[in-house]
Every structure is written in C-alpha cells, then in structure tokens.
C-alpha cells in the first residue's frame, strides 16, 4: 500500500478511537463520577 493510504487509515482509526473513548467517558461507567455544575447552581 502507498504511504498516503496508510496515513489516511491511521488517522481514521485514531479519530474513531477518540470518538469512542469520548462517548464511553460521557455515557459509560466513568460518567457516574461527573457532576453537572448547572444542577448544583441555586438561583
């Protein structure tokens, strides 16, 4: 394969991995430790 194809595949895999990790952090088990500052704010 050409170098450009390998770089494109690598960047695509990296982007998909980062998106998956962000979704897991937002909605998976680690999200239980996250707090919403807007819920804690008293008007």
UniProtKB/Swiss-Prot annotation:
It is a single-pass membrane protein. The chain crosses the membrane at residues 5-27. The keyword Metal-binding does not apply. GO terms for biological process: photosynthesis. It is found in: Plastid, Chloroplast thylakoid membrane. Keywords: Chloroplast, Membrane, Plastid, Thylakoid, Transmembrane, Transmembrane helix. It comes from the Eukaryota. May play a role in photosystem I and II biogenesis. Belongs to the PsbN family. This is Protein PsbN.
């Amino acid at each position: 394969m050409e170098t450009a194809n390998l770089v494109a595949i690598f960047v695509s895999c990296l982007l998909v991995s980062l998106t998956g990790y962000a979704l897991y952090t937002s909605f998976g088990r680690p999200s239980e430790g996250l707090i919403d500052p807007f819920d804690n704010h008293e008007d």
